Amino acid sequence: MSKILVAEDNPPNRELIREILEACGHEVIEAGDGRQALDKLEENLPDLVLLDIQMPVLDGYAVVREVRKTPRLATLKVLALTAYAMQGDREKVLEAGFDGYLTKPVDMVSLSKQIAQLLR
């Protein structure tokens, strides 16, 4: 299926997301912080990035800004994974350059739907 980079600093969350994605047949690349995410993007060009907003070293906003200004990566689909669920958070995430928004805790149905929409 698709190659997906999961950038999430919380190991149990990252493991859960990896298990869901692998069960759906996706190849998973993992990163534990924003800097690692950018390094992994240089090594592997995935079909999609699942990017936590709150991460050490570089947060998700800094990573998506870097992705959007890098010609080779600019059209890459990036889905925000966030605990932020207040009014206006979704709009802020989309305005920052993300292609989609999913709140945590992540459930398999919502994640699968978002991935299918973004990979069309």
Predicted regions and their residues:
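Active-site beta3 strand of CheY-like receiver
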Residues: 44-50
